[in-house]
């Protein structure tokens, strides 16, 4: 009997030893949401710049915006946007304002409305007022030189919200096929350029011209969320995972 019991125990131990190991849970994925975008049939030869302004609208106030191609992003509150057709955007939402269009914006729900307005503009439009009530607009950033390597042709312009999970290592070195302007919404990102890493926190604006090889990671314990205002040649990936060829 003792021999049989020992044999049974050995059998159980053997089964336990051959049980398959549990598969570790998959790491949280990066999420990307296109807030708004459009296709630009032709850029022509006109040099173009990035510009971003903040827009503040008091409860019940109505303002008019008129500028080159741009995308609105709602930070807080809500806004009724009328630009050909009417729509209401709330926190995290956005709207495309096509070049040459005058848009009417009204703060909704009796609340203060705070937005960002990302612009792709020729030099002659950089200093033109964006709103009929200029006190509602504050410039946050503009590129000092035209976006490089934008050749005549068709391009895609969009604003994308990206979230990196906590503890995400830096991604492989890459560069833009066109250009991008980042805005950190929340969290702190690690931005590496030329082997040097800098922390980028909420409200930071980071310009990525064509050919700038860089990396992004999130070493923190909270998600990192940022906006990418991006332009790239139609049919070409916005991000190229390689070092650009030298001219």
Q: What are these regions, as identified by a protein language model?
A:
Residues 63-65, 81-82, 102-110, 172, ...:
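Short beta-strand His + acidic residue motifs that chelate non-heme Fe in jelly-roll/DSBH
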Residues 84-102, 194-212:
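Short acidic-glycine-tyrosine-enriched beta hairpin
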Residues 67-85, 177-194:
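Glycine- and acidic-residue-biased ligand/ion/polar-headgroup-sensing regions
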Residues 4-14:
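Bacterial N-terminal signal peptides
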Residues 47-48, 58-73, 154-155, 167-183:
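A short beta-loop-beta micro-motif enriched in histidine and acidic residues
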Residues 56, 73, 88-89, 96, ...:
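Residue-level "contact hotspot" at macromolecular interaction interfaces
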Residues 20-54, 62, 87-99, 104, ...:
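A short, N-terminal "cap"/entry segment at the start of jelly-roll beta-barrel domains
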Residues 53, 70, 85-86, 160, ...:
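Short, conserved secondary-structure segments in the cores of folded domains
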């Amino acid at each position: 009997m003792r021999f049989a019991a020992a044999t049974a125990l050995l059998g159980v131990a053997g089964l336990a030893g051959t049980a398959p190991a549990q598969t570790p849970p998959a790491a949280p994925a990066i999420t990307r949401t296109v807030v708004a975008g459009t296709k630009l049939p032709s850029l022509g030869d006109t040099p173009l710049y990035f510009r971003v302004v903040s827009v503040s609208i008091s409860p019940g106030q109505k303002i008019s915006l008129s500028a080159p191609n741009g995308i609105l992003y709602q930070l807080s509150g809500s806004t009724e946007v009328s630009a050909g057709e009417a729509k209401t955007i709330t926190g995290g939402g956005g709207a495309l304002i096509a070049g040459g269009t005058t848009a009417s914006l009204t703060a909704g729900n009796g609340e203060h409305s705070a937005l960002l307005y990302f612009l792709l503009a020729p030099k002659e439009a950089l200093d033109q007022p964006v709103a009929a009530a200029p006190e509602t607009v504050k410039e946050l950033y503009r590129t000092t030189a035209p976006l490089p390597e934008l050749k005549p042709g068709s391009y895609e312009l969009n604003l994308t919200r990206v979230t990196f999970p906590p503890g995400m290592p830096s991604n492989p070195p890459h560069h833009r096929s066109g250009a991008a302007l980042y805005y950190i919404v929340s969290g702190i990102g690690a931005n590496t350029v030329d082997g040097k890493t800098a922390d980028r926190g909420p409200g930071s604006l980071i310009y990525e011209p064509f050919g700038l090889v860089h990396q992004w990671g999130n070493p923190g314990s909270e998600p990192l969320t940022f906006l990418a205002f991006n332009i790239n040649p139609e049919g070409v990936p916005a991000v190229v995972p390689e070092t650009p060829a030298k001219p």
